């Protein structure tokens, strides 16, 4: 089938007298741009009129219609669909089209071909382009032309369908036309589309008639409504733009679920909310957050159900968003609103956090719910926390570094006056600029289209950055009651200064609603408030009326009963409680504890953000700032009183009180009145710390006195010392006599010092002792011995050293005597005493007693089952005339209210006449209310008549309230008649309240003719109190240490009986009570001629010095001296005339 289409233009006229003329263009492209935009998930708030719609739609930022109804784009067509379920179809977009560019020039005889395999298509649209079409006549006229072409469609094996077209007329620029070609239905493999040029190709420059295929579009016809999708359709003349313009619309967005008592336009609430919703448009960010959570099509509704959200907490947040605040220009506006347009798929958690950030919110998952909290003021704290209610009483604090301290901000927001392009709102906190200089914080305010709100967000960020102190602590199962976002009050004595009790716990008997029983007496000031959680589940705050010991009386009764052992805090104006908002909870299953973290909370923050009010930093400590000042003056005032007929002189030290001082440290000293140069004989005497501004010293000696005082504030901040003038005082005559050291008794590693006090005074307090090694100059403090003690044992000293001691006495008010004369003593240097003492010390100790224990050398074979009342699990036995082989497995289990026990026994045994062999195991586990016990025992034994051999292994573990014990023992034993031998290896570790020990021993024993002989070794470490001793002991008649030499062994060290033999010894420092020389004693540099010395067994002593020449020789009858040349110079005794 052939269809012919003609498109005809017109040509110019003629005349007899001809002037070349050009025919006007008669071919014009008339292209329309049609755009269909999916604005978002519906349903959107509707647009009431066509005029309103045209004024809300923009092409490249220009509205289609102005407010005065004048048109900027005449003929433009605009349609809007809000995204309802059954919305109308937008006409003009009745198909789904896919356009593909081609741009191929057609030539006669060479068609353009495209194979189409998508059998779901309904039609194709072929766009033809003619760059220019004209003919230049011989007379110079420029007229139109003609070009013919056809489109042919081939379908499977059917006859082709042919469509013929012609373009007639003139154009000097690109002329385009579209041809929609219906495709035959019911095909199997698809279609082939061909475009042919019928007109012959031009061969003359006078004829211009090129033609080309511009594009092909695949079309599927449909009447699409796009339910639940808001749509915008725009159609306009393509000649109005060089490129496709940006299309935008200013409209209200998606309708969301809001409370049924809420007016979203006026942002008001009527009456109480019953928890039900209605669907309407709203710019309240809280309900947008809720909508994202529950919507299944594009949100989290497939995973989050409405019952998994706290709608009432969200209702409170939404009301805060709608509260009116200053707009900075004298007006009022709602606090937060959301103009966010989500245009792309994003991680759900990120979207929720971004939405929550609009109202300073935090999203978290807990208790099988998705929770949301906002940074907003709280009416009351949720918990009271003290050092007594956290693990180890410890709070850890942290804050940001100087680099993260910001003072100015730049907030980017969408400016509606400039088509919502980004604009910048800037601001600063003056006090932060003074402190941190200029450090700008850059923020993008999501969903913000108001400069005033951008300002508030910037100030909120700066103040939050300023209030960035973080706290972390650990609690037990009380952490179950902590909720992220809740605010807690903390009374930390380390912060408050530690001098006052501002928190604790109620007793197990908490008291009444008016009078509460606390675990300690609190510090109370008028107006202080008592905070404690009650049975209502809330923390109640009441003003304190009075405090009497551990009883606190409230001015107003609590609303509910107090809870036993509940933490409490005291809040006041002078010292306020720290408050933190909980941000994170982490449970440690291994310790059953919660790690809690929080960020600083300040009630004044929110008024500072909304209205620019001053931020109140709070007072949380009594520790003063800066340096503590000392007293302005210190005065010594003597006074006299008569007591029992005696005149007694006292001294008072007085000074004015110091601001912020908690206690004072006072010292004084004295010298004699005759000491005009004031060389102090006494060191400073300390008076115990006092909170009063003075001290009293009774019954003083005469002398020149001086005192000094310093003030101590919170946190142990101390002032400089302030001294008094030197003041003469007439008091008791004389002074304390120096004690007399009477004896120094030598002992093993100790000296027992004894002295006489040498004083008639009855008010002696103690004797001060100082020591030094003989030959040293510096004295070191040893101890103070309370009166009337007159001896002291100085222990843990080195062997044989000499020590010097000096002493002085002090009376009860601090007067000191002069030092006594030094007295010298020596630590014992008698080796036999040390050896006997060390022997006794070791052998009488617990590990020494274990070392002396004899082992049982008789084998302990087990050939029969031991669990007589056990239940039998398995028994296999073969027997023939008294000869048998058997295997037994038995068990015993029992449990009652006081004990649980389990035992398992195995026995493998054989017997033939007098020959027996067995392998036996017994495993026991037992638990009682007082002890846990486990033991594994294995015995391998063989017996023939009276000969027996056995290997036994026992492993035992015991634990109870008193301690723990673990023991591992292996014994190998053999017996022949009455003779027996055994080797035992034993490892024992134990610990209890008194101390602990670890011991390893190895013993070998023989019982021969009724007498026991053994050898062994033992390693042990024993703790007793603060002392720890380790030892290695050997027991043997002979002890050898050998080394290989030239292929054989030789002894380097031998102990035989009580004698020690050493082959070669090098000793750095030796103390010898008695030495026997069996050959020669000489120096290591002795060469027999020029240097060194030598003492021979025959008594000859030769001393040659260090090699400078000369020498001396001494025998039992002669002394001879020679010079450096070997010439004899002196000879005494037997005169021989020769060296």
UniProtKB/Swiss-Prot annotation:
Keywords: Host cytoplasm, Ubl conjugation, Viral release from host cell, Viral tail assembly, Viral tail protein, Virion
Subcellular location, principal: virion
Pfam short name (any one): FNIII-A_GpJ
Compartmental location: Virion; Host cytoplasm
InterPro entries documented for this protein: GpJ_CSF (IPR015406), GpJ_HDII-ins2 (IPR055385), J_dom (IPR032876), Viral_Tip_Attach_Protein (IPR053171)
A GO cellular component annotation in the UniProt record: host cell cytoplasm
Signal sequence, renumbered to the chain: none
PANTHER family: FELS-1 PROPHAGE HOST SPECIFICITY PROTEIN-RELATED, GIFSY-2 PROPHAGE HOST SPECIFICITY PROTEIN J, PHAGE LAMBDA
Role: Attaches the virion to the host receptor, inducing viral DNA ejection. During tail assembly, initiates distal tail tip assembly. During virus entry to host cell, binds strongly to host receptor in an irreversible attachment. The binding induces structural changes in the tail leading to viral DNA injection.
Listed name of the protein: Tip attachment protein J
UniProt source species: Escherichia phage SECphi4
Gene, per the UniProt record: J
